Amino acid sequence: MKVIILRTFYIFNLNKNYIGLATSEPNKIYIILKSIYSYNDKNIVIPFNLFKEVCNSINVEFFNKYFYDKLVNDEDYTVFKNIHMYHNYFTNEESKMNIFKSHIKIKSNREDNIFLLNIKDITNLFVCDFINEYYNYFSSSYKK
């Protein structure tokens, strides 16, 4: 029996006031987001307010349409409401993406999954994998 190890990627839409910091020192944005992610006090007002300052909401309709238009002709892709799935047995990729108003969450057995590869074209998104200490900022200057 093969064990599939899934990675969880969180994608945030950065506020324009933090784009400069994300470009010059992305590790500081990662530290802020990780502190929000790891916050375990019962008072959630502090991390909620910090999150609202650093991140903008996700345009759910835009991202649903964006991924649908990109992947609709791929037989390995399915979508239901805000949940996008990709199961490719030839490349052994198993990926699931949930689009929320606060963030996008991708669970995948691959770091180079179909959703991250396609989302790189959208600017000002910050990607984190808190468990594996991974982060990346997709700016307007980013090209494959």
PLM features: residue spans?
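Active-site periphery "cap/insert" segments of enzyme catalytic domains
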Residues: 103-109
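Acidic (Asp/Glu-rich) sequence patches and key acidic residues
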Residues: 1-101, 112-125, 132-144
